[in-house]
C-alpha cells in the first residue's frame, strides 16, 4: 500500500504571489511543445518558421486555457459553476477539461492557419506529436494536487494508494458494501488506483512515442492528426476504467464515464479521417 504524499499545491511563494505546481506543469508543457517543435523545424519540417511556431503557441495557449476551463464548466460541473460564477476564473485551483481544451486549440490553429496561409491539416499534423508530453505534464499536476484519483483498488495491488484528500468520498462510498467498509476501517480510507499516473503513461508517454515515430517519415496530409484522435481516444477510454468517474452532464455512471462519452467521437472521427486521407492519397 502507498499513501499519497499530499504535496503542497503551491510550489513557490514570490511575495504575495503563490505559484502553483499545476500552473508550472502547464508552463512545462508549453516549453516541451516549443523544444520538440523547434527540433522538428530544424530537421527538415518546413511547415512553419521558428518565429511562427512561437506565435502559434500563444494562440494555442489561449485556446487550451479558455477551452479547457469552459469544457470543465459545461461538461462536468455546470451546476456548481453556475452557482459560483467567480470560480470559473480560478484556473489555478485546477479543473481543466482536455476535450474543451482540445476544441479550443483546434479553433486557435484554424485562426492562425488563416493568418499565415497554412492549411489546417498541415498544422494539426505538425502539432499532434507535440501535444502528448504536455498532457503528461498536466497529469503530473493532477497527481501533485491529489485530484482525479482512481477507483477503488484491491489491497493486493502493490501500488494501490490511499488518497487522504478523498476522505469524505471514501466514507460515502464505503456505505455501499461491507467489504468497502472493512477496507475503510482497516486502512483509514479506501485504497485506489493512482489513475493520474496511468493517464500520464498512456495519454502522455505512450501516445507521444507512437506519434513521434509515425510522423518521423512523410505521411499523407491528415493521417498524423487522425492517429492522434484514435490514439488519445483509446488511451483515455481505457484509463477511465481506473479513474473515479466524474458526474458530468449525464450523471455519474460506473458503466461509461463522461470522459469516455467525449472520447468516443474522437475515435470514430479519427478512424473516418484515416480512411478518408488514405483513399485520397491513393486517388
UniProtKB/Swiss-Prot annotation:
Its main location: membrane. Its EC number is 2.5.1.145. InterPro entries: Lgt. Keywords: Cell inner membrane, Cell membrane, Membrane, Transferase, Transmembrane, Transmembrane helix. A 1,2-diacyl-sn-glycero-3-phospho-(1'-sn-glycerol) binds at residue 139. One of its GO terms (molecular function) is phosphatidylglycerol-prolipoprotein diacylglyceryl transferase activity. It is found in: Cell inner membrane. Pfam families: LGT. The chain crosses the membrane at residues 14-34, 56-76, 88-108, 258-278. It is a multi-pass membrane protein. GO terms for cellular component: plasma membrane. One of its GO terms (biological process) is lipoprotein biosynthetic process. The keyword Coiled coil does not apply. Pathway: Protein modification; lipoprotein biosynthesis (diacylglyceryl transfer). The keyword GTP-binding does not apply. Belongs to the Lgt family. Catalyzes the transfer of the diacylglyceryl group from phosphatidylglycerol to the sulfhydryl group of the N-terminal cysteine of a prolipoprotein, the first step in the formation of mature lipoproteins. NCBIfam families: lgt. This is Phosphatidylglycerol--prolipoprotein diacylglyceryl transferase. It comes from Chromobacterium violaceum (strain ATCC 12472 / DSM 30191 / JCM 1249 / CCUG 213 / NBRC 12614 / NCIMB 9131 / NCTC 9757 / MK). The gene is lgt.
Amino acid at each position: 500500500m502507498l499513501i499519497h504524499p499530499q504535496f503542497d499545491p503551491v510550489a513557490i511563494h514570490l511575495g504575495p504571489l503563490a505559484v502553483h505546481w499545476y500552473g508550472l506543469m502547464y508552463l512545462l508543457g508549453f516549453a516541451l511543445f516549443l523544444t520538440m517543435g523547434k527540433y522538428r523545424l530544424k530537421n527538415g519540417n518546413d511547415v512553419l518558421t521558428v518565429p511562427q511556431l512561437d506565435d502559434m503557441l500563444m494562440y494555442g495557449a489561449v485556446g487550451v486555457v479558455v477551452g479547457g476551463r469552459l469544457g470543465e464548466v459545461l461538461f462536468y460541473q455546470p451546476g456548481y459553476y453556475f452557482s459560483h460564477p467567480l470560480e470559473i476564473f480560478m484556473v489555478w485551483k485546477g479543473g481543466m477539461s482536455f476535450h474543451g481544451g482540445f476544441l479550443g486549440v483546434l479553433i486557435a490553429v484554424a485562426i492562425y492557419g488563416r493568418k499565415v496561409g497554412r492549411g489546417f491539416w498541415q498544422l494539426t499534423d505538425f502539432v499532434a506529436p507535440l501535444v502528448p508530453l504536455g498532457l503528461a505534464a498536466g497529469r503530473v499536476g493532477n497527481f501533485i494536487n491529489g485530484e482525479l484519483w482512481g477507483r477503488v483498488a484491491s489491497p493486493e495491488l502493490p501500488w494501490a494508494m490511499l488518497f487522504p484528500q478523498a476522505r469524505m468520498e471514501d466514507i460515502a462510498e464505503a456505505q455501499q458494501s461491507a467489504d468497502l467498509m472493512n477496507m475503510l476501517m482497516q486502512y483509514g480510507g479506501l485504497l485506489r488506483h493512482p489513475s493520474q499516473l496511468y493517464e500520464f503513461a498512456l495519454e502522455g508517454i505512450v501516445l507521444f512515442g507512437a506519434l513521434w515515430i509515425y510522423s518521423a517519415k512523410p505521411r499523407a496530409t491528415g493521417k498524423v492528426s487522425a492517429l492522434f484522435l484514435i490514439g488519445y481516444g483509446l488511451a483515455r477510454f481505457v484509463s477511465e476504467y481506473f479513474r473515479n468517474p466524474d458526474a458530468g452532464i449525464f450523471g455519474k455512471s460506473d458503466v461509461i464515464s463522461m470522459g469516455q462519452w467525449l472520447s468516443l467521437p474522437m475515435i470514430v472521427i479519427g478512424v473516418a479521417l484515416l480512411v478518408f486521407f488514405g483513399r485520397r492519397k491513393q486517388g
